[in-house]
C-alpha cells in the first residue's frame, strides 16, 4: 500500500507539473482568456486532488486500477476517478478538454475495451456473438452471411448435442438439444425431426442424423424414461414405433443393459420374464427363486408394483422406481444387504425372515421357509429376537463379529445341515421351544461334524440370548432335544432354560468331544457375543446375562440376574449357567465328566455344561473361542487353560456342579449334582476348588466360592468369586440353592473347604436332594445376602474397590487379586458392579 501510495503521489505530481505547463502555455497563448484559463488550471488541480483523495479514501480499492490505467489511457486528473467509475472513456471525453492527447488516449482505450467485450462474449456465449458482432464488426457479414453463421453456430451447437448422443444415459443433454435448437430457427428443420424422433421415438426416419439421434435418444429414453423396457411395454413401443433399424439395435443394447439391471432390480422371475423377452429374465427367475424365500414379501411386492408401473406407467415414472428397485433387489441377491430388510420385515414373517438368511447363505435351501419344518418354526419364532444376527456374526467372528449381518455368518455355515441349524439361530430361532424342537434334528449332524456343533452352539447361543426370558419355555423342549444321554437331556433342558439352543451343541459335542468342544467353545463365544450385542456390555457380560436371565426368570429373579451376569461378564459369565454360549460346552463336560462340570462349573455352569469333550480340551477351546469373544475371551482364556488343568483334577469330584437354571437346573442337577440354580454354584471336588485356588484362577476362585458365593453374590465377592458371586446373587434370586448351601461358609471358609463339600453335593444333588438343598440354600442365601450387603456397604465405603474398577475391568481385577486376595477382602462392590452393569446394560 505504501508503494502504491508513493507511486500514485509521484504520478500525481507529474500530472500537476504537466497541468501547470499546459495552463502556462494556454495562458501565454490566449491573453484574452488568461482569466478563464487561470481559473481552469486551478479547477483541474482541485479536481485531481479531490480524485486522488477519493481514491485513497476508497481504501486503495481503486488505486491499483488507477495505476494500471492512468499512465496508459490518460494522465489527466480524471484518470483515478474514471478508472474507479469504470468509465474512463466517458470521463476522459468529458474532461478531455485539458489536452487533446488525453482525448486520443481515451479513444484508444475505448476502442480496446469494446472489442474486448465482444471477444469475451463469443468465447462464453454463442448467442451473444451474433448481436455483439453485428453491432460491432460486420453488419455486412451479419446480413450477407447470416445463413453461414447460423450454420456455423448449428455445427458448433450440434457438436455438443453429439456428446449427449454419445452418452445415452443423459436425458438433460437430449432435452438441452431440444430446447437449444428451438432458439436458432436455422436448425429448425432438423430439430423437428430430432424432436419427433426423440419425443415420440417413432419419427426418426427423415434424416440419417435424425435416426442416429433417435437411436441414441431412444437408448437414453429407454434407460431413463423407458426403464419400463424391463417392464417390456416401453421396450415394445419404441422398437415397433421406432422405424429406424439403428434405434432398434440401440434398444436391444439398452435392453440388454437394462436386463442386467432388471435382474438386479426385479427378483420376481415371472414379472421379469414377462417384462423382457430377452435371456436376462431367466437369470432373474433363477436368482429370485433363491431369494424369493429370503425376501418374498418385499421383493415380490416391490417388483410387482414396480413392474406394473414400469410397464403400464409412463417411462419417467418407471425410471425413478426402477432405480430404487434394483437396489432392494440387489440387497436380496446379496446376503449382506439382505440383513437389514430381512431382519425387520421379512424375518418377521415366520418363514421368510429365517429363510432369507438360509437362502442367502445357501440357495440350495431357497425354501428357507421350507428347508426344514424345524427351521421355519424356529425362524418364525426367532425373527423377533435381534440377537440372531450377532449369533451369526459370532459364528464367524465371535463377539467382534456381532455387527456382521446374517449374510456374513451364513457363508461360514458352509455345510447344508449346519446352515439349516444356523439358519434357525440366524433367523433368531430364539424361542427356546421351537429352537429346542428344531435343534433336535440338527444335533446329530452337529455331533457328526465338529464344525456344525459350533454352528449349533452359535445358533443356539443366539437362541439362548434371544430367549433370555423364554428359556423357561425352552427348558421343557430342551430335554427332548437332548435325545442323547438323560444327563444330556437334563442339561440340555437346563441349558435351554439358560441358552435354549446352547444345550444342543453339548449333545453334538458329546458325540465328538473335540469337535463338540470346539463347537461349544465357538458357541460360548458366540453366545457371549450375542448376549453382548443385546446388552451393550462386553460379550462376556452378554453371555452370562443371557443365562442369568434364564434362571432368574425361572426363579423370578430376572431383573437382578442380568446385572449379576453383567458383573460376571468379567468372571461370572463362564461361571453361571447364565453363560449361555459356554454352557453348551460346560454342559458337555458336566454330562460326560461330572468332574469336568464341577471343576469347570467354577468357571461357569454354561462352560461345564457346554464342554462335553475332555474338560481340558473343551475348556481350552472355550478359552480360544472366548479369545474372539473379548472379555469373555480374556476370562475364558485365563480360565480355559487353568480350568482345563483343574478340570482334570476336579473331574473326579467336579460332577457336583451347582450351576444350572433353577427350573432346568433341577433336571440337570441330577446330572451335574449340586447344580441347583442356573447360577454356576460349582460344587466342585475339593481338588477342583483347591486347584483353582492354587491356580489363582478367577474361574478357580469362582468354582470354590461360587457355590456359596454365587447364591450370595456379596459373599462370593468377598470370597473368591467375583463373577460367580454375582451369579450366585442372581442365582439366589433365581433359586440357586445349591450355591447357597455352600455359599455362606465358602465366603468365610477357604475354597478348599468349599470344594470338598461340593464333591459330596454333586453326588447327593440328585433331583430329590436338590429341593432340600435349595431350601437350605435359601436360608443360607438370606444369611449370605446379609453378609454380602454388609460387605457391599463396606466396599462402597471403600473407593478402591469401587464400582468403577469392577465395571471397567471386572475380569482383570479378579486376575490381579487372585482368588485368595478376594477371599481376604472380597469386595462387596461386586454387587454394586452388578447394579452398575445393569444400568450400563
UniProtKB/Swiss-Prot annotation:
Domain of life: Eukaryota
Basic residues bias spans: 114-123
Phosphoprotein in keyword set: yes
Region (Disordered): 1-45, 64-448, 655-679, 745-769, 812-833
UniProt record, GO biological process: neuron projection morphogenesis; phosphatidylinositol 3-kinase/protein kinase B signal transduction
Biased composition (Low complexity): 26-39
InterPro entries: NYAP1/NYAP2, NYAP_C, NYAP_N
Ranges of biased composition (kind: Pro residues): 279-295, 759-769
Compositionally biased residues, Gly residues: 94-103, 224-243
Described function: Activates PI3K and concomitantly recruits the WAVE1 complex to the close vicinity of PI3K and regulates neuronal morphogenesis.
Membership in a protein family: Belongs to the NYAP family.
Name of the protein described by the UniProt record: Neuronal tyrosine-phosphorylated phosphoinositide-3-kinase adapter 1
Protein species of origin: Homo sapiens (Human)
Source organism phylogeny: Eukaryota, Metazoa, Chordata, Craniata, Vertebrata
Gene responsible for this protein: NYAP1
